[in-house]
């Protein structure tokens, strides 16, 4: 649809913003507010995701030495590789898991967002501060601001709060109507945002980043989940969260 210009780029940008700031948060709030969280192994789920991020971050830092031989000014290059290999696209994760596993899958995906987004924001800003250019440096206040203003994180907090306090049916039904349009429009927005003809100049670096993100990260999750003993749908959701493409912010 984007290629045929049925709608121009500004409309697709508006759709993406509506999904990110309204539809997907509504979907998360609706799901978490009525979810049975007692059946979710939260600690094991969190341990798998955080350990996978930490393990991949450590391996990437070791790879920085290999980059020095090819890239004299390897700091900014490494920070770009690190972002592309560790960040994940929450839109795509929700769009895949929702239709496959229903509300329970969305609940686990929302928890994955609540766990991974703060950890990844902190890790990536630290790497940018150490390895990136001076223009990339961000202080602790900026990191905190990015986390607490993320609509998906806010939705997780609101949904978990309503799960504890309860929510009137009329409000739930309204949020349900809004959230139901989220997944379909999200898939359209993700597809319209693909720019296969604008691959970065350094194809080797792009290839390495893609392989780490799409193959290395899910393998890391599988290995850690096996060690910890995470099974069933939580394991599946963790693997999918590790296997989806990098977030748009990584670009």
Regions found by a protein language model. Give the residues of each.
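Alpha-helical transmembrane segments of multi-pass small-molecule/ion transporters
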Residues: 1-251
């Amino acid at each position: 649809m984007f290629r045929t210009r049925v709608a121009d780029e500004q409309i697709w940008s508006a759709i993406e913003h509506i999904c990110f700031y309204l539809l997907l948060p509504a979907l998360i709030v609706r799901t978490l507010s009525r979810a049975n969280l007692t059946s979710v192994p939260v600690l094991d789920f969190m341990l798998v995701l955080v350990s996978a991020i930490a393990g991949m971050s450590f391996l990437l830092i070791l790879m920085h030495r290999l980059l020095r031989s090819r890239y004299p000014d390897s700091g900014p290059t490494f920070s770009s590789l690190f972002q592309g290999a560790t960040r994940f696209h929450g839109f795509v994760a929700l769009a895949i898991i929702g239709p496959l596993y229903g509300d329970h899958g969305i609940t686990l995906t929302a928890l994955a967002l609540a766990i991974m987004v703060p950890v990844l924001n902190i890790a990536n800003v630290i790497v940018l501060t150490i390895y990136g250019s001076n223009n990339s440096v961000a202080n602790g206040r900026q990191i905190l601001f990015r986390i607490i203003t993320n609509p998906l994180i806010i939705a997780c907090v609101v949904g978990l709060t309503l799960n504890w306090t309860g929510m009137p049916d009329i409000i739930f039904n309204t949020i349900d109507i809004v959230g139901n349009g989220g997944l379909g429009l999200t898939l359209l927005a993700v597809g319209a945002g693909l720019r296969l003809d604008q691959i970065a100049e350094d194809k080797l670096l792009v290839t390495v980043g893609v392989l780490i993100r799409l193959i290395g990260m899910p393998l890391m999750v599988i290995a850690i989940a096996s060690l910890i003993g995470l099974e069933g749908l939580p394991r599946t959701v963790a693997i999918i969260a590790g296997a989806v493409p990098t977030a748009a912010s990584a670009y």
